[in-house]
Amino acid sequence: MRSLHGTGVALITPMLPNGKIDFKSFKKLLRHTSKADYWVTLGTTAESATLTRSEKTAILEFVIGNNTKKIPVVCGFGGNNTSEVINELESIDFTGVTAILSVSPYYNKPSQEGIIKHYSLIADKSTVPVILYNVPGRTSSNLSDKTTIQ
């Protein structure tokens, strides 16, 4: 894995008034942030929970295809339905992706054991390293130190 260090930019998803992805603006965003040490695409800042699977695929392909400076790319893949996250992971080509950023399950408030099982299943299926995304203010659950180490 390429080392991630420095400043990463969490990319938004520019949208047109008709609800379609604005790839022209997205290209400008990539140029504007091209001095970042890495990009985070499809994270919570990109409002990925509101995107369809085909939109996510199109965005990831667009970012990878326009990554002329070969900036490391971290791709957000998370959710509260472990099976669906795994299904998405298995359907995506991660060529050009350095790691995935996976938010802990939200809404259903899993136990620490549930969080461990969730991340273990994702890590087993992922072809790239998994970064644990702990944001208790949004997920209503907090990764304990012990859970993170496991």
Predicted segments, located by residue:
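Active-site beta->alpha loop and helix N-cap motifs at the rims of alpha/beta catalytic domains
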Residues: 1-142, 148
